[in-house]
Amino acid sequence: MSKNIYVKELSKHLNQEIIADFLVLQKELREGKVQYIRLKLADNSGTITANVWNNAQSISEKFKEGDVIRIKGEVRSYKKQLQLSVKKLKALDEVEFDLVD
């Protein structure tokens, strides 16, 4: 499992599990076959779409747009676009991250 990965490096980790910190630019609770969260995440190297498929409602209540979160998830390709499938997520306190990253 790779840690501290930047958006620009995600293509090197396709189908691998990563742990990384991102700023939440957008958060949307959606209904499909199941309820899920669609996220737009960013770091200083770019942005990426991410999805949270399990326990969407309860996880959605734990963070908001503008928060920095740490995710554990898998880098996937969908319709030739990279995205993250989030397995675990936690909002970080300011002391847990460096805004320069």
Task: Mark where each language-model region is.
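Flexible glycine-/small-residue-rich
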Residues: D43
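OB-fold nucleic-acid-binding modules
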Residues: M1-I19
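OB-fold single-stranded nucleic acid-binding module
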Residues: Q26-R38, G46-D101
